[in-house]
């Protein structure tokens, strides 16, 4: 196995506060003594700090009664007890975390809960209520610094803002638009000088001779309310004690400061209390905080587990990293997100390779594309050998085992470059001790939620209170690895933070600063300015460029925040940053996933996927006893007695012989319509407690990505260009070729014959729908002369063809993409030549597939333009990701070499394919002129321009079809290689 990942030396262990013994001895019983359990102070405080309403209900319940309210409270407490003894995911005092280290032996000894520590800070919801209050009163923010919101977009003397945080409590969904007047310009300029709000009010009053400063304060407050400006009273997400930060930022004379200091002191006292001893102190703090602001949540609590030893075998780490590599090989071959891939196509069509576009301009609805439209999609794989193993496992009542030979075959058949594997990642796995798997004394179960996008993300919010030595060791590893990655590729890594749309997400977004720079959206202290960020494109991806650093920039998150819940800008930056990355995903095999049962899938002592059963409400009828029906299902599918039910991100261990547990399952099934049941390993191990570890992994090879030249050009509007008449013709892709032959070509011919136009060209395109872009040019640019003619033709097509819509749009020439304003007219002449050639190829029949005809035409074009060998190689590098289907090309290689031999004006081509020969030489003077044009000084390299010609020719003939285009380039590559050794002459 050529494993590309190496594990960290450090892991995070996550474990529930109680041991498995609680579940086994008490929670399987039908008669749980809740009075006895509630005498446990840790349990009581845990309930209070996570679900206060449930805590309040406890004192009002008569446990002897059997009414609905009592049953509901008992059920809720049971679920909490199960979670606190069997689920490791950190949450309040229910479970906690610690750092461990891989070594020679397994040795985990968790201390008694009295040694564990709490880390307590104010909850994000209450925090942002406080910040909103402070930013709403000049008295509090007058001494703070003025911060201009870098997301403000200024265009045509107007200011636009399309993102706002939850601090303002502004539910605005539409784009803010205000006039960018002289006062806003003045504020913008002065905000760069680190001035306070008090100084700003004075400056505005003096500049505009406003005697009444209260008027200025009201105006400034309106700007804050709209988040055009804000203050540095906002704590950054890397601040470990946001309340103390605010206290230290305020004038100590403010009356509120004393109250905040009191709350802070009480929180400190509460943090130092042993678990289970802080019930009344917590209530006192909540009372103090609620007197200021009422909130659903007041405090965020994380628990740190103390231990005497925390070590696991290095061999376990190595096998986990191998399992991650196998999962990567088995993951669907999709890169990044489909949303960004679609956006890349739009970008390429308008801007091409050879210019950078300012980020805010590109995302503007006013003069850019706006944000990408979300595309719902799901991916699964068709893995033949898994299907075979599935059938054998079912037949033999066993599991699916992936062997070393299977891995070798996966590697052999892998078509994705290791360059596209994640630079780093994290894998979540439950750890069990015991010899359940032959030959091993331990085993790991990969979590259904595999891990994170990058090493350190899961650790982010916790790192402030970890073991210092281990924490520093981990951060040193991450920084070293990413420094290597940055140096290999000449790029900058920056940490991305955001004041979120939902204030509760602050708790997840809190993190630790690792990288040299950060971009803080809606927050102060940002090292990166959005105005400095540009977007560029290669043939297969978009990338971000920092003008300040003169390099590509990649944004990473050091938290487990789901970027889907971020602002549109946050999502866009994250999605582009992992564009062209194939991530590790859970095993999804389209054939097996559709079945109600999947056996365990295992590699060595790593369970890649536990045995899984799918239950849905349609399996039950109202006339049949539910418990009897479930018993039948359980017997039929051999579902064990102890299982984990999974619904969404939630998981709960249940015993299927216990009626109370079955009631929980029944309710969840009714609520969600379907649930998954996973096998549990609680009875197959000798664990004293549930253990889950987070293992950071680093890619040890293939860090160097394909290099490319970042263009110097910045997108701008050019004057004095020809004014073309541009039409979009909406027509389904399957009918476009017929439409071009039967309607478009006769129309163009008539326009030309009557001297209504001088030039034309067309492009096939797809946005929300398929359409054809038609461009027409008159030298006098007076299109009123032909409008009625065009309208009549359009009406005729609407009645008689598959054309169903029509629009007149602006045409913006891709000046940078094709060499500059001084050559664009000659390039547009070539577009007409290429359009005529493409139409002729579309409407003609050939004795070889049209991909080969197009490849021949491309070879002809490059030879005629005298494109040299190195430029041809560059064209292939820039435009073809991986050349393929060589077996399909082999039988034509000799014929292709003959047909592309230029001897005697391509006499062999003329003999074998006379029509194609005629098409290529029709209007050959345009190519003669183009050859001279491409000798000039150009904004863009010749190879890039030719690459765009090739792309557009494939587009005109095949439509948007990357696979056909890739095949055409593969054929062209084979022609080039063959002609190195044989010119096609017998």
Curated annotation (Swiss-Prot):
Q: Does the keyword Cell membrane apply?
A: yes
The alphabetized UniProt keywords are:
Cell membrane, Membrane, Plasmid
Q: Where in the cell is it found?
A: Cell membrane
Keyword DNA repair in annotation: no
Q: Mainly localized where?
A: membrane
Pfam families, per this entry?
Answer: Lant_dehydr_C, Lant_dehydr_N
Q: Identify one Gene Ontology CC term for this UniProt entry.
A: plasma membrane
InterPro entries associated with the record: Lant_deHydtase_N, Thiopep_bacteriocin_synth_dom
| Family the UniProt entry places it in | To B.subtilis SpaB and L.lactis NisB.
Q: Outline what the protein does.
A: Involved in the post-translational modification of the lantibiotic epidermin.
Q: What is this protein called?
A: Epidermin biosynthesis protein EpiB
Native species of this protein?
Staphylococcus epidermidis
Task: From the UniProt record, report the name of the gene that encodes this protein.
Answer: epiB
């Amino acid at each position: 196995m050529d494993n590309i990942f190496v594990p960290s030396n450090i892991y995070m262990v996550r474990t529930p506060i109680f041991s498995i013994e609680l579940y086994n001895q008490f929670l399987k019983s039908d008669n749980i003594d809740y009075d006895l359990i509630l005498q446990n102070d840790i349990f009581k405080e845990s309930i209070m700090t996570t679900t206060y309403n449930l805590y309040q209900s406890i004192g009002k319940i008569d446990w002897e009664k059997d009414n609905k309210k009592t049953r509901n409270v008992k059920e809720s407490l049971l679920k909490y007890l199960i979670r606190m003894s069997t689920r490791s995911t950190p949450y309040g005092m229910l479970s906690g975390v610690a750092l461990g280290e891989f070594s020679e032996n397994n040795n985990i000894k968790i201390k008694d809960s009295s040694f564990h520590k709490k880390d307590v800070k104010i909850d994000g919801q209450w925090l942002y209520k406080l910040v909103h209050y402070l930013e709403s009163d000049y008295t509090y923010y007058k001494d703070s610094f003025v911060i201009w919101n870098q997301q403000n977009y200024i265009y045509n003397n107007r200011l636009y803002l399309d993102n706002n945080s939850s601090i303002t409590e502004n539910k605005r969904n539409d784009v803010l638009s205000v006039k960018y007047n002289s006062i806003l310009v003045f504020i913008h300029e002065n905000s760069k000088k680190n001035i306070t709000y008090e100084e700003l009010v004075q400056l505005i009053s003096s500049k505009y001779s406003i005697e009444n400063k209260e008027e200025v304060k009201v105006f400034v407050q309106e700007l804050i309310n709209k988040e055009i400006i804000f203050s540095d009273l906002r704590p950054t997400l890397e601040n470990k004690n946001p309340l103390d930060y605010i206290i230290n930022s305020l004038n100590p004379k403010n009356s509120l400061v004393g109250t905040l200091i009191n709350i802070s002191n009480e929180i400190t006292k509460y943090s130092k209390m042993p678990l289970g001893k802080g019930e009344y102190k917590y209530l006192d703090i909540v009372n103090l905080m609620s007197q200021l602001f009422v909130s659903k949540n007041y405090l965020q609590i994380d628990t740190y587990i103390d231990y005497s030893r925390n070590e696991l075998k290095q061999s376990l780490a190595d096998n986990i990293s191998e399992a991650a590599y196998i999962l990567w090989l088995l993951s669907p071959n999709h890169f990044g997100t489909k949303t960004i891939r679609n956006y890349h196509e739009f970008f390429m069509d308008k801007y091409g390779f050879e210019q950078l576009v300012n980020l805010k301009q590109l995302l503007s609805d006013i003069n850019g594309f706006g944000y990408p439209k979300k595309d719902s999609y799901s991916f699964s794989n068709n893995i033949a050998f898994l299907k075979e193993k599935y059938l054998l496992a079912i037949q033999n009542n066993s599991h699916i085992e992936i062997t070393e030979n299977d891995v070798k075959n996966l590697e052999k058949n892998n078509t994705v470059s290791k360059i596209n594997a994640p630079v780093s990642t994290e894998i979540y796995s439950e750890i069990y001790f015991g010899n359940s798997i032959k030959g091993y004394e331990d085993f790991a179960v990969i979590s259904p939620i595999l891990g994170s996008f990058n090493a350190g993300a899961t650790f982010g919010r916790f790192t402030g209170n970890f073991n210092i030595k281990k924490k520093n060791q981990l951060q040193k590893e991450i920084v070293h690895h990413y420094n290597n990655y940055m140096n290999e590729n000449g790029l900058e890594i920056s940490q991305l933070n955001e004041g979120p749309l939902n204030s509760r997400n602050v708790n997840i977004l809190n993190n630790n600063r690792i990288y040299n720079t950060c971009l803080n959206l809606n927050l102060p202290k940002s090292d990166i300015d959005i105005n400095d960020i540009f977007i560029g494109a290669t043939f297969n991806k978009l990338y971000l460029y920092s003008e300040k650093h003169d390099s590509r920039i990649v944004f990473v998150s050091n938290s487990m925040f789901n970027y889907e819940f971020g602002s549109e800008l946050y999502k866009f930056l994250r999605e582009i940053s992992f564009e062209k990355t194939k991530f590790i995903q859970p095993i999804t095999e389209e054939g097996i996933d559709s079945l109600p049962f999947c056996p365990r899938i295992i590699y060595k002592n790593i369970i890649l996927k536990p045995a899984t059963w799918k239950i849905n409400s349609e399996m039950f009828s109202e006339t049949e006893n539910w418990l009897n029906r479930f018993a039948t299902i359980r017997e039929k599918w051999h579902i064990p007695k102890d299982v984990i039910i999974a619904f969404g991100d939630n998981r709960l261990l249940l015993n299927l012989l216990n009626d109370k547990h079955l009631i929980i399952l029944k309710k969840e099934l009714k609520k969600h319509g379907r649930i998954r049941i996973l096998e549990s390993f609680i009875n197959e191990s000798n664990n004293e407690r549930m253990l889950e570890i987070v293992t950071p992994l680093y890619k040890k090879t293939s860090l160097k990505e394909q290099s490319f030249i970042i263009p110097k050009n910045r997108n701008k509007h050019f004057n004095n260009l020809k004014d073309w008449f541009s039409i979009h013709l909406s027509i389904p892709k399957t009918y476009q070729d017929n439409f071009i032959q039967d309607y478009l070509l006769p129309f163009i011919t008539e326009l030309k014959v009557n001297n209504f136009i001088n030039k034309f060209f067309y492009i096939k395109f797809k946005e929300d729908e398929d359409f054809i872009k038609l461009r027409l040019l008159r030298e006098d640019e007076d299109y009123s002369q032909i409008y009625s003619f065009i309208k009549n033709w359009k009406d005729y097509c609407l009645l008689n063809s598959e054309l169903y819509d029509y629009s007149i749009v602006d045409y913006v020439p891709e000046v940078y993409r094709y060499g500059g304003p001084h050559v664009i007219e000659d390039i547009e002449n070539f577009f007409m030549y290429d359009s005529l050639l493409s139409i002729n190829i579309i409407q003609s029949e050939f004795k070889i597939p049209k991909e080969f005809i197009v490849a021949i035409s491309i070879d002809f074009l490059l030879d005629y333009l005298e494109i040299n060998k190195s430029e041809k190689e560059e064209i292939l590098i820039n435009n073809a990701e991986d050349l393929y289907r060589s077996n399909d090309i082999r039988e034509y290689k000799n014929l292709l070499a003959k047909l592309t031999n230029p001897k005697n004006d391509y006499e062999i081509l003329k003999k074998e394919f006379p029509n194609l020969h005629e098409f290529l030489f029709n209007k050959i003077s345009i190519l003669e002129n183009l050859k001279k044009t491409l000798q000039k000084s150009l904004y863009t390299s010749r190879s890039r321009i030719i690459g765009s010609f090739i792309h557009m020719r494939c587009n005109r003939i095949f439509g948007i079809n990357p696979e056909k285009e890739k095949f055409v380039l593969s054929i062209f590559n084979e022609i080039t290689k063959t002609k190195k050794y044989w010119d096609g002459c017998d």
